[in-house]
From Swiss-Prot:
Residues 138-161, 545-619, 644-718, 755-846, 860-891, 1084-1118 are annotated as: Disordered. InterPro entries: ARM-like, ARM-type_fold, CLASP_N_dom. GO terms for cellular component: cytoplasmic microtubule; microtubule organizing center; mitotic spindle; mitotic spindle midzone; nucleus; spindle microtubule. It is found in: Cytoplasm, Cytoskeleton; Nucleus; Cytoplasm, Cytoskeleton, Spindle. It comes from Cryptococcus neoformans var. neoformans serotype D (strain JEC21 / ATCC MYA-565). This is Protein STU1.
Length: 1249
């Protein structure tokens, strides 16, 4: 039964309280509070007297009395204040609330925390007594401002001021005051009130105050303001208008960009719903148009992906963004508006990256229609390459993101992009046609638009335009022909236009255009068989024969592959003798192609691996530089760079020259003419050709060591800028700049595309037929040569996709001694095919010829990890690619764990981990428990309050339900079924467990629970690593744990990041670590330097020395611990990357090094130099390494070079250095030693108290 207190009892208590001394008041207050616990109502006449006596008690210097009032009395008395009439509550807000707000600045947590709770109670009562009235009910004078939080804080009409408004006014005064603790606690009160009242409590009036607090002079206030803003604006229920207003205030009040970007990212990043582009490209399109049409596509990946995400808060925010861009696109391009135009284009791409086109599609389309597309039609034609290139990227991404919603713009843009296909600037022409391919692939306009556009392009005189047009014709038929058949047939004249386009293209003077048209024809034949048959019958005999040979459905019977030691160099003869010499040549060529195809299948089964970064060939002379050799694509996924087949655009076609058509590619007898595996058509000579082509054993030998006196100066190691920038990994970490004329690059599969064949399959020029040793290749007899040329021309595209040879520079021939001046790399074959020793004589028989497959494994790319190859690889009979990496481990191996446990830096953690596992072992069931058995434990973990038993059960469940690495396509079905069964156990559980553990691992948790939670995290990484997707969240969690002062926790983070470096994709982990480090340093800014105003340089320098860690403040120790952790982790990742990737990432790494090298802490400066040494271990070029940090002073550079020399990683000086196997092993040793040094340096960040 609820207890009641009479008016006389309360008055008696009040009288005793007024007359008693402070110690006696404590007893009275505590006893009266106990009486009020079961009371539901107090007499109205006694409320006001108690409200009037409370302020002196709250302001009392007697600490026990103050604590009793706040903790034992107010939580029970304030809810009993009647809500109606509101005079009692108004008196409480006017008398008690100011006193409570004063106590928010009390240093004792129990005081300011209890005061905050009482303020929240008063706020809840105020909102219940007078719910807010919408702003629309106010008159023009604003006097009836009932509950609207957007009202002015300086309300003159006090009688009309509502209770919520009065409560807000007092709290705002505190937030705008000077006491930092009051501000921090006031923001906590605001957060609690918003969580309790929800939408009833508006946000707009608080945003200005909170934005000002983001730039407060006290770090604690800034940190709490960040967290408060994120907590108020991040829930999905937050109105978009509030976010838009917040973004506007950030700009208007000039908040620092680092703070603003971090907050906007945290508020908006979790809202985007991923939307995949329509998968309309079938397997045929993916197979035939998968590769980049020329080397020019290589730099586009790094530039196209290097766009910062722009988050949009609301449709109104998006409308303002577009409106601010429109003035830049008015009129012609000038020196003043071209840069804003480019920034606007990049910003729109950033919006798409932030999913603005998905969340606010209607507003996005309206913005495009409002003038943005018209502006892009100007920028895409800009003479400035960067502006035009960014516009092409945007025009490619818009159809991919918008799909059918982009249809309204297609008819306007196609003519503009069509004109660009004839541009002489190859880079822009290729980018523009990539955009056309994207439009054709992802939009759903009427086929009339595409067919008319393609038909007009085929009628052009420019061969480049015709080449692009026939490739677009092929793409259109693959994507749209089947489902658009009825529309095409129902539109008058459209099918005739399509038929005429085919007739024109099949009779084109350029063979490349004809070949691509033949491939497109058979897709046309599948849909309109009768018309295609009529068209084919109208061709002459030779044209029809070539068309039939291009039929992909024509399959030849497989032939046996070559033997490894007893091969004759030619396939076995047919059972029946060919009737004529011409048929004999045809059969011979067909058998050669079958042999190549069969060897490629063996290579696919033998050398299947994970994707790898590929590169284009580097030519010796700077004069021969293609658009493709401008940079290295940056990896953006755990398996390296995957080229999207649906976005690649075909290259234009060049007409063959007499010199290129009159000569044939033959096996080169000298090392400098070894054909590069990339883009090279590998031929296996027939007996007929072998009679006129001599081989030399020099092909299998290393080039001479002495340099050639006739070597051109432009080929020196130090002279060619291209050689200094682009190098390629050799056997075990060294980087070769080439053998002879060019470096042997990595392998890349080239699609079987006729246009590309015409561009890239260029034969050797006549000036290159003469060898430097004086020997000349003998030509075939004219009659035989003519027959071979005719037959091969008709069958050259029948086989599988081939490797092709880039166009060499005419007239540049070099002797075999050319490569003696640079480190040489053994020739690399595509597959581990069967080989035979070469003949010792120049005219030896063809049995010694080495058979190389040209069929590539589509998955034979690998990430740019450092190679681990044998030092004797160059002398091996079967050679492997120089950039051959081990596949990325998909699971933690026992060897990895054992190696980590043997490190002395983390012994305390391993001992504690074993101890905790032994404690949990009694809970382990005899058989693996079902998934529903740990559902209560997972729910407790998600709530943030798990018990020790909950965590132990989750850890045991993880260890008893491991998930093996995802099987590859070559593995048997049993392995795949086992993987799916193991994965099914975790369906719906893994993300909950992983996210719950990472969120739970915070430094302020109980030590025992925190250590057990770390055990759970370790079990997940060790046993369920194939299921882990969000490594970014994991990195953020590890950096958060660096705020702990517990040595075991810090050792655990050290060991875990060392393991992640081994099992994660290093490029992806490097990006995540950079992001987490930036976030950590933003949360823990550097303390203001006391020597900033010191004019004495010696005193300033000495003040930066950290002589004793005991003198450091806790905040500084925490910052240094996380900073050191991040620098050393990044260094470990760097050691697992290759030189081209380091060159690409060098400026960003250099910025990290430069900031750390200027840090006042000596341990951070030491870590910065260690990171620089790690970069040097990979590049082996101190000039290149120091170029990444151009802001270093000369003294700092000298010190860095001194450290390189002392650690043995400074490169040797001179052009005649010898690349021995011992040197290769030594460089691998340098990496291992540096990894150990970084691990040791990381351990110094463990705070031991």
């Amino acid at each position: 039964m609820p207890k009641t207190l009479t008016e006389s009892e309360v008055e008696a208590t009040f009288a005793k309280l007024k007359a008693a001394d402070p110690d006696r008041k404590v007893d009275i207050i505590q006893f009266f509070g106990l009486q009020l616990e079961d009371v539901e109502e107090l007499p109205a006449s006694v409320i006001d007297p108690f409200l009037l006596i409370l302020p002196p008690l709250i302001r009392s210097p007697h600490s026990l009395l103050l604590s009793s009032v706040l903790s034992s009395f107010l939580p029970y008395f304030l809810p009993l204040i009647p809500k109606h009439p509101t005079t009692h509550l108004r008196l409480a807000l006017l008398q008690v609330l100011p006193a409570l707000l004063e106590k928010l600045n009390d240093a004792k947590e129990r005081i300011h925390s209890a005061a905050g709770n009482a303020i929240v109670i008063l706020g809840e009562l105020s909102w219940e007594a007078e719910p807010p009235i919408p702003a629309s009910n106010l008159n023009s004078s604003g006097s009836l401002k009932a509950g609207s939080l957007s009202s002015s804080t300086a309300t003159k009409s006090k009688p009309h001021e509502t209770l919520p408004h009065l409560w807000e006014r007092h709290l705002k005064d505190v937030l705008q005051g000077k006491a930092w603790r009051s501000k921090v606690e006031g923001m906590k009160v605001l957060t609690k009130m918003r969580s309790k009242e929800g939408a009833k409590m508006g946000l707009k009036a608080w945003l200005g105050v909170l934005v000002d607090l983001l730039e407060d002079g006290d770090g604690n206030v800034r940190d709490q303001a960040r967290e408060t803003v994120v907590e108020l604006l991040s829930p999905p229920s937050t109105p978009p208008a509030a976010r838009s207003e917040f973004k506007r205030l950030l700009v208007a009040r000039n908040v620092r960009k680092t703070i603003a970007d971090d907050i906007i990212t945290r508020i908006l990043s979790g809202e985007g719903s991923d939307r995949s582009t329509p998968a309309v490209m079938n397997s045929e399109l993916g197979k035939e148009e998968g590769a980049s049409r020329s080397g020019a596509a290589a730099p586009a990946h790094s530039q196209a992906d290097d766009v910062d995400i722009v988050y949009v808060a609301s449709p109104q925010d998006l409308e303002r963004e577009f409106h601010s861009m429109l003035p830049f696109f008015e009129g012609k391009e000038t020196e003043e508006n071209w840069a804003p135009r480019e920034r606007s284009i990049v910003r729109i791409r950033g919006m798409m990256k932030g999913q603005a086109h998905v969340k606010y599609q209607a507003a996005f389309i309206a913005g495009l229609k409002g003038g943005i597309v018209e502006g892009m039609s100007k920028t895409v034609l800009s003479l400035r390459t960067t502006v035009a290139q960014q516009s092409c990227y945007l025009l490619k991404e818009l159809p991919e993101g918008l799909g059918a919603a982009f249809d309204n713009f297609v008819e306007f843009l196609l003519p503009i992009l069509g004109k660009m296909s004839g541009f002489t600037k190859k880079l822009i022409a290729d980018r523009s046609q990539t955009a056309v391919t994207s439009i054709i692939t992802h939009t759903t306009v009427h086929p009339r638009i595409f067919i008319n556009h393609i038909s007009s392009g085929i009628q052009e005189k420019n061969v480049q335009i015709r080449a692009y047009s026939v490739n677009h014709l092929k793409t259109f038929l693959i994507v749209h022909a089947s489902h658009a058949k009825h529309q095409i047939e129902a539109t008058p004249g459209l099918s005739d236009t399509l038929d005429a386009a085919f007739r024109k293209a099949l009779a084109d003077v350029n063979p490349g255009v004809r070949e691509v048209t033949r491939q497109a024809f058979w897709r046309y034949h599948e849909v309109w068989r009768s018309k295609a048959e009529v068209l084919m019958n109208s061709l002459d005999g030779q044209a029809r024969k070539q068309l039939e040979k291009a039929n992909p459905r024509t399959a030849a019977s497989p032939m046996p592959s070559y033997a490894s030691s007893s091969s004759t160099g030619a396939p076995s003869s047919a059972n029946t003798k060919p009737p004529s010499k011409k048929m004999d040549l045809k059969a011979m060529l067909a058998e050669r192609r079958r042999a190549v195809k069969e060897a490629g299948k063996q290579a696919q089964e033998t050398n299947a691996g994970s994707p790898r970064v590929v590169s284009n060939p580097v030519f010796a002379s700077p004069g021969v530089q293609h658009a493709s050799i401008t940079g290295l694509p940056r990896s953006s996924s755990a398996v390296g760079i995957a080229r999207h087949v649906e976005t690649s655009s075909p290259s234009p076609v060049r007409s063959p020259t007499p010199s290129s058509s009159a000569t044939r590619i033959r096996p080169s007898p000298s090392p400098e003419r070894i054909q590069s595996p990339i883009q090279t058509k590998i031929e296996i000579d027939s007996p007929l050709r072998s009679r006129y082509t001599s081989l030399t054993p020099d092909l299998a030998r290393s080039p001479p060591k002495s340099p050639s006196p006739s070597l051109s100066p432009s080929l020196g190691l130090g002279e060619s800028p291209l050689r200094q920038v682009l190098t390629y990994p050799a056997a075990n970490g060294r980087h070769s700049v080439g053998e002879g004329k060019r470096a042997i690059p990595e392998l890349v599969e080239v699609a079987d595309n006729g246009a590309e064949h015409e561009v890239d399959e260029l034969t050797l020029k006549e000036g290159q037929k003469t060898r430097d040793d004086g020997n000349t290749d003998q030509e075939l007899p004219p009659t035989v040569q003519e027959e071979v040329d005719q037959v091969e021309q008709s069958q050259q595209f029948e086989s599988e996709p081939r490797l092709e040879h880039p166009e060499p520079q005419q007239g540049n021939t070099f002797s075999t001694s050319t490569s003696g001046r640079v480190p040489s790399t053994p020739a690399r074959s595509i597959a581990t095919g069967t080989t035979a020793s070469l003949p010792n004589s120049r005219n030896g028989n063809i049995k010694g010829e080495k058979i190389i497959s040209s069929r590539l494994n589509p998955e034979a790319f690998q990430t740019p990890l450092n190679p681990k190859t044998s030092a004797l690889r160059s002398s091996s009979a079967i050679r492997t690619p120089a950039w051959k990496d081990s596949p990325r481990p998909e699971a933690v191996t026992p060897q990895m764990m054992q190696k980590l446990k043997e490190r002395r830096h983390e012994r305390s953690w391993w001992v504690k981990r074993q101890e905790l596992l032994e404690k949990a072992s009694p809970l382990k069931p005899l058989t693996p428990s079902p998934s529903f058995a740990i559902l209560p434990d997972i729910e407790a973990l998600e709530l943030g309050a798990p018990t020790l038993k909950n965590l132990q059960k989750i850890a045991l469940f993880c260890s008893s339900h491991p998930v093996r690495p995802e099987p590859t396509a070559e593995q048997d079905e049993e392995e795949k079924r086992a993987f799916e069964e193991e994965k099914r156990v975790w369906t719906g559980l893994f993300d909950r467990v992983m996210n719950g553990v990472v969120d739970f691992l915070r430094p302020d948790k109980d030590k025992e629970l925190l250590e057990q939670g770390l055990v759970v995290l370790w079990e997940i990484v060790q046993h369920q690593w194939p299921l882990v997707d969000d490594t970014q969240r994991l990195c953020h969690g590890l950096f958060r744990l660096r705020e702990s002062s517990d040595a075991v926790v810090l050792e655990s983070t050290n060991a875990l990041i060392s393991l992640l470096v081994q099992i994660s994709d290093p490029m992806l982990l490097l990006c995540n670590l950079r992001s987490s480090l930036d976030r950590f340093l933003t949360k823990h800014p550097a303390p203001p330097s006391s020597s900033a105003d010191n004019s004495d340089p010696m005193t300033s320098a000495l003040s930066q020395l950290s002589l004793s860690s005991s003198k450091e403040s806790p905040e500084k120790r925490t910052r240094n611990s996380g900073y050191l952790f991040g620098l050393t982790s990044i260094g470990m990742c760097v050691l697992r990357l290759s030189a081209p990737v380091i060159v690409s990432e060098g400026p960003k790494l250099g910025q990290i090094v430069m900031e750390a090298i200027n840090d006042p802490s000596s341990i951070i400066r030491q870590a910065a130099h260690s990171l620089l040494l790690a970069i040097q271990c990979v590049t082996h070029d101190s000039r290149k390494t120091l170029a990444f940090v151009p802001a270093m002073s000369q003294g700092q550079k000298d010190l860095a070079v001194y450290y390189m020399a002392q650690n043995g990683v400074l490169e040797q000086i001179g052009l005649h250095k010898k690349a021995t196997s011992e040197g290769e092993k030594g460089r691998e040793g340098d990496r291992d030693n540096m990894t150990g040094e970084l691990a040791g340096l990381m351990s110094r960040g463990v705070i031991r108290e």
